[in-house]
Design a protein with these regions (language model features):
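Short, polar/charged alpha-helical segment
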Residues: 39-67, 96-99, 148-156, 198
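Flexible hinge/capping segments at coil-to-helix
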Residues: 27, 121-137
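Short, well-ordered beta-strand elements
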Residues: 28-41, 61-67, 134-138, 166-168
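Short, low-complexity disordered leader/linker segments with a strong preference
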Residues: 1-32
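Short helix-initiation/N-cap motifs at beta->coil->alpha
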Residues: 65-76, 89, 161-182, 190-193
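Pocket-lining segment of extracytoplasmic ligand-binding domains
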Residues: 92, 172-217
Length: 217
């Protein structure tokens, strides 16, 4: 049986709408689903709301949530059987499929329509994309949706990655905030709550939303 991997749990979240209101399921009868998410962020709020309001329990499901800390880590957990479902970008499924694997993960639903990262700098200034010319951005894992979306947005603003601006892909997803506050790079792209935590500490400022710049992907 093919392992099920997804960037979302929207398909499951729609079940209450399709099946009507649940009558409640005894805890002993719930089926545990091990869900590995790429990061714990308000970006995925619909999933947390569904869990908190008991929508999954109404359908006989108990969600066991784990923070994978990156799409590559999520995929490893799904492929190895440590998790049943992954919440991350679809790129990892494509990479596994392109390797010719018969038992490859599949995408079955969608929770978000754009990238959730924010571009952050060290100074609270009026931002212009030309400010990035000749600078270095910590952009995350090469080939990941956040990094690819960043490169797309840079090109849309006339900046060629690795020529006009360096996109550093050497830092793991869950280490990007620490690398930036530690002095690495001039800019960084971060999801919430890491972005707000950096702002609160006075070590960086949100300049723009990458998702707002790229649009739906």
């Amino acid at each position: 049986m093919k392992k099920i991997f997804a960037p979302v749990l929207a398909a499951l979240m729609l079940l209450p709408l399709l099946c009507g209101c649940g009558t409640g399921t005894a805890e002993a009868e719930l089926t545990t689903v091990r869900l590995n998410e790429v990061t714990h962020s308000v970006f995925y709020a619909p999933q947390y709301v569904a869990m908190e309001l008991g929508f999954f329990a109404d359908e006989g499901l108990a969600i066991e949530l784990t923070n994978g800390g990156g799409a590559d880590k999520v995929m490893t957990a799904v492929v190895s059987g440590q998790s049943d479902i992954g919440l991350a970008g679809p790129e990892s499924c494509i990479y596994i499929y392109n390797q010719g694997k018969d038992d490859h993960p599949v995408v079955f639903g969608q929770l978000t329509a754009c990238d959730g990262a924010f571009l952050m700098g060290r100074e609270d200034v009026s931002f212009n994309w030309e400010d990035l010319r000749g600078k270095t951005i910590i952009g995350g894992r090469k080939g990941g949706v956040p990094e690819m979306t960043l490169e797309y947005v840079l090109r849309q603003h006339g900046l060629e990655p690795q020529k006009d601006v360096i996109v550093d892909t050497s830092v793991q997803f869950n280490m990007m905030a620490g690398a930036f506050t530690g002095g690495q790079g001039d800019y960084v792209t971060l999801f919430e709550p890491a972005a707000t935590q950096v702002v609160t500490s006075g070590e960086g400022y949100i300049l723009c939303s990458i998702g707002a710049e790229s649009g739906a992907i």
